[in-house]
Amino acid sequence: MRRGLLFFGLFLISLVIIYMEPIWSYQISPNDGQELPLQSPPPTSLNLESIPTQGTAQWIGQPMKAFSTLYGEAQSVTDSGFGFFRHQFRMDADAFMEVTTINQRITSIKVLGETPMDIGPFKYQMSLEELTTYTVISPIVSVEYGGETYSLELMEDDINYRPLVAFDNGSYAILFFDHQDKRSGLYSLMYLDTETLLKLAPYVLTEGQPQFFVAEKAADWITIDEQKSETSRYLMQQLRRSYDFPAYSTSLALQRETQALLTDFLINQEDYLSTERLRSYQRIQRQELNQNWVLTNQEVRTLVEELDEEKTFAHFEMPVYDPIFTLLSWYSNPYLVSRLFYDESEAIGVAFSKENMLVLFQEINQPTESSEQP
């Protein structure tokens, strides 16, 4: 009897060893991170490791005055309404830079095109494979803020289109990749501090309490919303040109129509949303969750049903605290790219109401005389 039990026990142990061996080997294998095709996940590490600080990353946390002394004054400085200011530098038709500050300290820098900023060790149009020669991309990011530990998780699309890099001065960079044939590779970067990273929430928060930007009650929201609309149209035109697509047509009539549609949606949400969807919107509006909320395809059709549905497409998103960051995310979003890379002539309207953003796209046969390029 004892021999039988001993034999049975040894048999079970052998089965466990045989079954678990490939799993243990997988966990400790040093060769897991192999280079994969461009749109497959690149080599990853379980935890994000920082790289030496260089280039633009050195400016995060520094005084805006020192930055302006070296690079000149911004063409415009505007209030975001969410506790930070936006300093915009429009170099030429192909270059754009925006610096955000809190109390005159730099919290983020976004660069697009050939600006004076040093983006080393990165370079424009580099591939994900090239990025892995400088750092190993991690799906798990742990950060310290306010004495607390926060964990972020990057999904597959994040790793392919918006990977995160950490520098040893405590700053970060979101790298925006485009996988279209016309211009494949890195096309824009956003350098930012920990607070901005947590509040913009570009990745899933898996540990720690969500952090939020708070709308300022005393802010001049009419002016702020108009400024954000103009900036968004400007950047969308710039990105449009970079792909050699026809410039968007814009008109005061379409802009007013977009604003009126956004206002109607915010006032009469029960006409457009189911009870469940309305509750989900309200939860995010009350800042119970820190994640993006967008209209579904069916909700978009309901929203634009009084317009020419065959020629009109709408995209609504909230919360949008930083329009430039949001737009850069759209252009590296595999689900929005079919609309943004539509190569026929279109008119656009862009409207804001605090953290709510609506964009209307309307097909047109040819540019009209009212076309402009804000």
Protein language model regions, located:
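Hydrophobic membrane-insertion alpha-helices, especially the h-region
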Residues: 4-22
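Short, well-ordered surface patches within globular domains
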Residues: 222-292, 296, 336-337, 344-348
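Charged/polar, solvent-exposed surface patches and flexible loops
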Residues: 69, 133, 234, 238, ...
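A well-ordered secondary-structure block
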Residues: 115-118, 122-170, 282-371
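Short helix/turn-capping signatures at newly exposed starts of structured segments
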Residues: 18-248, 263
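Intrinsically disordered, low-complexity repeat and linker tracts
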Residues: 210-216, 367-374
